[in-house]
């Protein structure tokens, strides 16, 4: 199943996300409720296959994301951030997943700007419950100084463990906004409108 989630502060994106998902995808969509309004909840219930309630867990904000991945009942799961624009059929992404690994696209803009290899957590695929997923959840609970779930995951990996725990997905499954600035001209199945400028771009499409 595909999995996404958000809280009330991001639910304005949901009609746009769901429309793109329904246009291109046939696989079930599971939603993790991080704290939606009643209106947001109604939109979700009408359009997804199952809803998971994560409103009462101790994790805050995007740190609920790894936990929602762990709790998703599907054997094969692909998390997609709500600021991702699905532009093509992506159902075949499930054929690329490997046991005991998180399947992710390299975050080339961050790799370029931060000096070591990063992977973007906007699209994360996995089979069953990989050990690294449990480690990611534990690290987010202990997190005090990292700014997001992607940074926490990067911190618990080194170049060697990255090879054994992360499977590289083709770039087309998660093309970052900054890649367009950097001259990317390859295929785009998922366009990831990151950051404030990305949100402004999404608003312009509503």
Go through each PLM region and give its residues.
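GT-A fold catalytic core of metal-dependent nucleotide-sugar glycosyltransferases
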Residues: 53, 60-117, 125-126
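Structural element of the ATP-grasp superfamily
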Residues: 44, 69, 153-157
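Short, solvent-exposed loop/turn segments at the edges of secondary structure
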Residues: 118-119, 186
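Short, solvent-exposed loop/turn segments at secondary-structure junctions
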Residues: 8-10, 36-37, 84-85, 108-111, ...
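N-terminal anchoring/stem segment of glycosyltransferases
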Residues: 1-58, 161, 194-206
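Short, high-confidence coil segments that cap the C-terminus of an alpha-helix
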Residues: 26, 74, 98-101, 163, ...
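Catalytic core and acceptor-binding pocket of nucleotide-sugar-dependent glycosyltransferases
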Residues: 126-205
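Hydrophobic/aromatic beta-strand patches that form the interior of the parallel beta-sheet core
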Residues: 3, 30-32, 52, 78-80, ...
């Amino acid at each position: 199943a595909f999995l996404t989630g958000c809280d009330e502060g991001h639910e304005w994106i949901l009609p746009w996300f769901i429309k793109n998902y329904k246009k291109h995808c046939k696989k079930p969509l599971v939603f993790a409720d991080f704290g939606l309004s009643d209106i947001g909840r109604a939109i979700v219930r009408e359009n997804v296959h199952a809803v998971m309630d994560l409103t009462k867990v101790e994790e805050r904000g995007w740190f609920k994301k790894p936990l929602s991945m762990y709790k998703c009942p599907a054997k094969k799961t692909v998390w997609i951030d709500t600021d991702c624009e699905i532009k093509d059929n992506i159902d075949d992404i499930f054929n690329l997943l490997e046991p005991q690994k998180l399947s992710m696209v390299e975050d080339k803009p961050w790799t370029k700007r931060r000096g070591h290899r990063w992977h973007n957590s906007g699209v994360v695929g996995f089979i069953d419950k990989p050990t690294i997923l449990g480690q990611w959840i534990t690290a987010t609970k202990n997190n005090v100084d990292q700014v997001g779930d992607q940074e926490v995951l990067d911190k618990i990996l080194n170049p060697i463990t990255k090879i054994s725990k992360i499977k590289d997905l083709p770039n087309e499954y998660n093309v970052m906004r900054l890649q367009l600035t950097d001259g990317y001209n390859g295929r785009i199945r998922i366009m990831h409108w990151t950051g404030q400028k990305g949100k402004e771009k999404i608003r312009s499409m509503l």
